[in-house]
């Protein structure tokens, strides 16, 4: 299965009638493995910041989590494994695998729990597969 198929079929899938707004699988080096058509153009320093928070949990909390220039307030995640961000009625979930970052961006009516489930389920599967 191609990386694009993982984004299209597993991240942008329907859950209880809702979809993520955008999603991507990004290498930990910042390279794009696959992304939805509307995933924001991100800066390499945004990925560097995310990786720093995975290595030293809490580093993003004071400044916020940025993806494509959009600032998300960091909310409770799983140190070293998942970073969650909130912005108004939407937010973002970032799951770290051995080699990549699975990123899901959502807006209402999708709930944070639905976004977390989609992103973390694929992340856990890829970890089990060695990625």
UniProtKB/Swiss-Prot annotation:
A motif (Involved in PIP2 interaction) lies at residues 81-97. Gene3D superfamilies: Dynein light chain 2a, cytoplasmic. Disulfide bonds join 13-115. It holds the Pfam family Profilin. Phosphorylated by MAP kinases. GO terms for molecular function: actin monomer binding. Keywords: Actin-binding, Allergen, Cytoplasm, Cytoskeleton, Disulfide bond, Phosphoprotein. The modification Phosphothreonine is found at residue 111. Binds to actin and affects the structure of the cytoskeleton. At high concentrations, profilin prevents the polymerization of actin, whereas it enhances it at low concentrations. By binding to PIP2, it inhibits the formation of IP3 and DG. Belongs to the profilin family. Multimer. Occurs in many kinds of cells as a complex with monomeric actin in a 1:1 ratio. This is Profilin-2. It comes from Hevea brasiliensis (Para rubber tree).
């Amino acid at each position: 299965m191609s990386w694009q198929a993982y984004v299209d079929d597993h991240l942008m899938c329907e859950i209880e009638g809702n979809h993520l707004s955008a999603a991507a699988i990004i290498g930990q080096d910042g390279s794009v493995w696959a992304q939805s058509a509307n995933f924001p153009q991100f800066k390499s320093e945004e990925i560097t910041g995310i990786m720093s928070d995975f290595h030293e949990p809490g580093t993003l909390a004071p400044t916020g989590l940025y993806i494509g220039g959009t600032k998300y307030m960091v909310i409770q995640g799983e140190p070293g494994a998942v970073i969650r961000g909130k912005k108004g009625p939407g937010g973002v979930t970032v799951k770290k695998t051995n080699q990549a970052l699975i990123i899901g961006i959502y807006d209402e009516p999708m709930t944070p729990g639905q976004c977390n489930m989609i992103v973390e389920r694929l992340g856990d599967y890829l970890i089990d597969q060695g990625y």
